[in-house]
Amino acid sequence: STRKESSAASDVYKRQCYARSFDNGVTWYKANGKKYDLPIRLGNAEYACRIPQNSELINQTSMSADAGGNPYIASYWRDPDSDVPQYRIVWHDGQMWYSRQVSGRTTPFSLKGGGTKMIPMARPRIVVDGGEIFYVFRDEERGSKVSLAHATDVANSKWSISDLTDFTVGAWEPSHDTELWKSRKRLHLFVQHAKQGDGERVVEFACLLYTSDAADDSLRVD
């Protein structure tokens, strides 16, 4: 989870903390298997990554785990000496926490401001197979396409980034068939072009509507 300092501020997320439960939230454990004394507070939380406030840290991102149950967290934030947020991965190898930059972005932006932001980079989605990482994202820098960062070794491999589509998906946020990945290790993405106005503003948008009946079997743009 990301810690939120105050709901009244506009850029308040900081730190990434970790806890897991095997009984639907009755008991909670740290990455090393140690049981939490509830409630979880600032003083007893396990910190996966300490991130300063006002770092453009995004909330509600994706997690995965390897065969040993070690967690991998996909997120983005910016370094204190930069105004460019970068995609990151945070993981636990069974002994300690690590973090690594995934992207090499050059475009600055800020999450500050009222309402829901039209964000130029999507919340990433991650899946892990052994030590192999598949990191799905959408970035305005790459034409807002469906993009994939891949590494065969999370700690040492160079990231290979490619676009999976040759068309824009607008404000799409990555999602995948979690059950198919869990059962067969096949990564199927749900893709739909989407739009969002900054601060809940309305935007014009066309969609395809398929009508199928005896009188009208057609595809049209609405």
Regions found by a protein language model. Give the residues of each.
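Asp-box/BNR beta-propeller loop motif
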Residues: S21-N32, I89-S99, S103, A151-I161
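Entry beta-strands of beta-propeller and related beta-repeat scaffolds
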Residues: S7, G68-I73, G130-Y135, S183-F190
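Conserved blade-ending motifs and adjacent loop-strand segments that build the rim/top face
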Residues: Q101-M121, S157-K182
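Single conserved hydrophobic/aromatic residue that forms the stacking wall/gate
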Residues: S1-A9, Y13, Y210-D222
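Structural motif
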Residues: D11-C17, D81-R88, E141-H150, Q196-L209
